[in-house]
């Protein structure tokens, strides 16, 4: 399971020109699922995201988690995080889990974040989405569990 994490001052996701999820200050997280992932990875990722210390403290140092600053999280499913570009010019997607396996696991990540007290908005699974992000820092990290 992979997550591309961006610290944001705001983020939103739209489907067919309608905003389906938006957050203020916090994190925008793109989540990719691979074949061997399961509930344990989903829970571990939710815990790492909730505790990841990339939010600024009063001295401007990345020392606080999104939980500690009452931040919000936008979660967007992103199968392309498992794109393989080692051969040719067109990515291969064989490492990405199919939707029947991936969707419940993304939902488990969202549930795990909510269980940890976070406000979470989401995109729409399998939809063509437009994501608007105001990246702070910029601070962008890749997590893998």
Residue ranges with predicted function:
Residues 131-144:
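C-terminal edge-of-domain segments
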Residues 119, 126, 130-134:
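GST superfamily/GST-like fold recognition
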Residues 9-11:
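RNA/tRNA-interacting regions in translation and RNA-turnover enzymes
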